[in-house]
Amino acid sequence: MVSLIKSIKAHSDKAWSVSAHKTVPLLATASTDKTSKIYKLSVKQNFPQVAQLEDTHKRSVRAVSFKPPLPGVESNFLDLPALASGSFDSTISIWGIDEPETEILSSPRNEWNLMAIIEGHENEIKAVGWNHNGSLLASCSRDKTVWIWETDPETLEEFECISVLNDHQHDIKHVVWHPHQNLLASSSYDDTIRLYKQDLDDDDWSCVGVLNGHEGTVWCSQFEDNHRHQESNESSNRSKIRLVSVSDDMTARIWSKYIPSSIKHKSEMVWEQESILPPVHQYPIYSVAWSAQSGKIATVGSDGKIVIYIEGDDNSWSIDSVKESAHGVHEINSIIWALLDDQSEVLVTAGDDGCVNIWKP
């Protein structure tokens, strides 16, 4: 049963997006009020606001994304938190903090600094996302393009555009990276999801897959962060990647791709629609999150419901729980799984009421 832990009146206008840092208990928000805010994910401290990022974007902040921690870096001084925010003003802001984790968590306020402003898109930015090691940042826009930016994840001083992908026919709503490899997915108003990889021979990025099946705008997609399918298919020399997507057509669909252990041609990568989750939503579904801990999937959308799905041993999906009117009469724009400072897992939602709600799933 989904129960409310805390409702934060974070913004004076719509809250569009939320992002949680993977190792430091911090939560970032994005809003039409042109600000991003950062909160501590601490029940004991009552989820205090520790920073407000403002006076940079001229229009709505549509998306936020924390940079993942550097792999294998143990010192907090070498890997400080950073945040990307994407705006309807067509720019991306990169924010950083000079305090180690111990000071971040003990201080009532954190000083976040603007490190870079990235320009290139011609229209509103709809989503931003970092790859698994923070060396690449993807952005998508109403201008029908996906841009990939390369940076040094230790300094974040410069961002170079290394690819502009224009395969979609309409507005692109969302981008997301695979949690462990450089595989990128984009979701679009043209009812499709596209997958991109870099060619190892010439370093060019290209579309390596198109997922057709939705009968309306695809608002969001998320990769599964789970190694069990890879482990279970070791004997067949194939690894399995799964992706969940949600759409205007009120469905959530799971797609899977088998990749041979030695791949020579793009044609050897085969995607298939694995399942459609049991129907619950009565209006468009805007956001989906796949838990790395429990394997559960959570969806939200225009009808104000939170729906949680659980997978059985036979790979069939069932409804775990439903929360009606999670933001009153308002639409819900974003949902994520996050870890509190005690390592317990929660759901976080952002709605048209400007509230960011934290839930016990």
Swiss-Prot record:
Matching InterPro entries, A to Z?
CIAO1/Cia1 (IPR028608), G-protein_beta_WD-40_rep (IPR020472), WD40/YVTN_repeat-like_dom_sf (IPR015943), WD40_repeat_dom_sf (IPR036322), WD40_rpt (IPR001680)
Record keywords, A-Z: Cytoplasm, Nucleus, Repeat, WD repeat
A GO term from the CC aspect: nucleus
Family per similarity comment: Belongs to the WD repeat CIA1 family.
Tell me where it resides. Answer: Cytoplasm; Nucleus
Protein name per Swiss-Prot or TrEMBL: Probable cytosolic iron-sulfur protein assembly protein 1
Supply one GO BP term. Answer: tRNA wobble uridine modification
Q: How does the annotation summarize its subunit structure?
A: Interacts with NAR1.
The family database entries (PANTHER family) matched by this protein are listed as: CYTOSOLIC IRON-SULFUR PROTEIN ASSEMBLY PROTEIN CIAO1-RELATED, WD40 PROTEIN CIAO1
Q: Where are this protein's WD repeats?
A: 10-49, 56-105, 120-160, 167-206, 213-265, 280-319, 327-361
What is the role of this chain? Essential component of the cytosolic iron-sulfur (Fe/S) protein assembly machinery. Required for the maturation of extramitochondrial Fe/S proteins.
